[in-house]
Amino acid sequence: MDARRARLLLILLVLVSAVAKTALAWLQATPVYMPDEYLYSSLSRSLLESGQPLVQGGSAHFWALLVPVLEAPVWLAGSVGTAYRLIQAEQSLAISLSALPVYWLARRLRVARGRALAVAGVTLLIPDTVFSSVLLSESFALPLFLTAVCAAVAALEAGGRRRWAVFGVLALLTTAARLQFVALLPLAPAVGIVLEVRRRRFAAAARLAAPLIALVVIAAAVVTVAGVSLVAGRYGSLFSQHVGAGGLLTWTSYNGLALAFASGWVVVPAALVGLGYLTARPTSRADDAFALVTLLALLTLLVQAALFAQGGLQAMERYTFYAAPLLLVAFGVTWQRRLLERRAHAALALGLTGIGLLLPHFAEFLFSRADAAPSLLAYRALLHVMGLNAGLAFGIAAGVLGAGALVLGRRGYGNALAGFAALVGALLLGGAQFEFHDAADRTARLAGGSLSFADEAGAHDAAYLTFSDTAASDTEETAFWNRSIVEVLRLGKGVAGDGFRSPHVQPGRKGRLFVDGRPVARELVVDRTAAYARFDEPARVRTPTADLFAAGARLQELVDGFIRSGSWLATSGTFNAWPSGSAAGARGSLDLRIWGTNPLLELRGPQCNGRIAVNPEPTDVQIHFDAPGRWSCRFAVPGFGTIVGTHLVGIHAQILCFAQEPKTCPPHPGPKVGGGLELTAAP
């Protein structure tokens, strides 16, 4: 194949990939990867509107700002929906550009043009390219990382200040996209020292050691002065957890297995053979440089992923898949240099077969939490079809593919191995895309109606009022789709689970909301997923998940801990009422219908106390209250809670009526199945 035709095919490959990934991304109804997607979108909007990297009006302690800067101009497009789709298209093009540095690397290592194109094509089917449909940094970080590796190989091969400067700039840009790549800066000089020492060029090694030592000294000084937590930002907690050698080794193995799937599985033995050959018998300085850079980068990424995995107890393929294209290039070298027939490849393929057949024994553990490992998400899709047999089927398929790698390798059929790698990648990518779309569809169905309801109603500088049991993901979903929400407030116990700024609200005697002693003068978007809240005026807009109220709205009645999905009471919460109108106190009644397996609902507080028997059959309960000011009654459900979505719930409950004089609830309807009970709040 001539060079001109190869270039045209490479450009066509990038464009087809970009269009296909954009089309698939546009089928996704809403963001699914919270809080990360909300973080990046909020930073982009804030940089565009204020020039500062803020989330909910406060610092996010997040230093990798290249992607928010690149995506900020897109938010000028108009609506959130339009900007969302344009960013997905931008990311699809960016991640498709990864084929270019992969092709360059393969050609630099003297892989034939056709085979280099095949390697580039398989790269675009890596399951983790599904991240082009979500607003994360991976779509930009992958091509930047691969380009930085190209620059490192060029600098290590031929030297020169200009080449080293290009590498330094690319390494800094990659670090600005994802902070984990700060390890790139010392990586290339370290490899250079090894190369020079192997060639007994100690003076050249000393010259490379100087900038490496300078980097280490500067990094140590910054960490010493600023502290690890400040330098690491949102990842500071990672350095406070205990890391055991056993756990590190275990999770490195699991992440290595996930990376093997991400790389196409069947080509992994050939990739390892290629790396070993390039390291032990390099025919050029480029061979040596590529092999050592790849091995060192692979080790660094696996250790980073293992550190994160110990905190989340799941494979962190998000942190390792960047090495998959490098493994594919190494496979291309093995294919080109006719190393597939070697015994080393046969032995490794046999080992791959054994690992595949062992997968069913720990499939549930490995695949049960795979949100950060797209190549493992296909297992969930298989579960929908095969149920508990999915692990067995997955293991058998992996074992058969390993055996196929053994047979095809012995015959030297590299083209067939590349084809199977593309097929594995396409299937795993399709499974991951299906899971992303399914999660997005479920979220959109639960939201109901328009997701940008506040923006469409003309809201401006609104505050989002959340409660004790409001899930962070629900907050982020609503705030993402409504740019009119400029801050998030929290009423009740606890803190937001995402770590973003959310000041606590204190209601006044008449239900007016205050933050730090100042009244909230903004329009209010009020969460409905984890509380029942009624204000002194009707909502401007009402949706299944949130309501929009005019500025100055006052709380009248509140059940903090009422989980609307499935009609539940949380294991603890409060009933509250504030005096309405000109009334001096809160006087009225609350009618509940309760049922469940936990036997008791306890009421506690100076204005109420009692214990209500809970039966499996629905029971109607009427609670009267008469307080000189605000009425507040804490409730608790002793016993075991049940996890529903992200909520810990105790019993089922329906709010039949919650009203104050002059309005009244209907007379108590009398005993129901299981016995009716009337409880009057104690003064």
Regions found by a protein language model. Name each.
Residues 109, 148-164:
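Membrane-interface transmembrane helices that cradle and orient dolichyl/undecaprenyl
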Residues 24, 181, 185, 190-280, ...:
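Membrane-lumen/periplasm interface segments of specific transmembrane helices
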Residues 493-683:
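C-terminal luminal/periplasmic domains and tails of membrane-associated envelope-modifying transferases
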Residues 119-121, 163-178, 189-190, 215:
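Membrane-interface alpha helices of multi-pass inner-membrane proteins
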Residues 15, 89-110, 147:
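Transmembrane-helix motifs of polytopic, lipid-linked glycan transferases
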